[in-house]
Swiss-Prot record:
Lineage of the organism: Bacteria, Bacillati, Cyanobacteriota, Cyanophyceae, Synechococcales
Pfam family, one: ATP-synt_DE_N
Protein name as catalogued: ATP synthase epsilon chain
An example Gene Ontology CC term for this record: proton-transporting ATP synthase complex
CDD domains listed in its UniProt record: F1-ATPase_delta (cd12152)
Transcription regulation recorded as keyword: no
Amino acid sequence: MTISLKVLAPNKNVYQGEAEEVILPSTTGQLGILPGHISLVTAIDIGVLRVRINSQWKSIALMGGFAEIESDEVIVLVNNAEIGSEINVQNAEQDLKEAKLAISKFSENEKNPEKIKALKEVSKAEARIQAAKN
């Protein structure tokens, strides 16, 4: 048995295919999905979606969104996403360095919108790096 998986971003169909297993980065932690899963809707965090196809894993960096799970179908609607094998690791590592540098300009307890934006950019860069290396 397999799961039908669709990963959709506003301007593109990121991924569509069959999977043996899907692991989603939900806002409450990792969510493993096998065929026959109960129906549910969940918020997706910035992180890595992992898909098992023919006993091999494929990674997709997700930038937040929602997922709808129905028995043997998963539809993921995200702000943006990148297939791990298409990510330039050097660019992602440079983005991570720049975001960490931006954070270092603020005090630890400071709640500045620019600091919050930089923290989000760190999460995005880390997800891209992790997806590219898996």
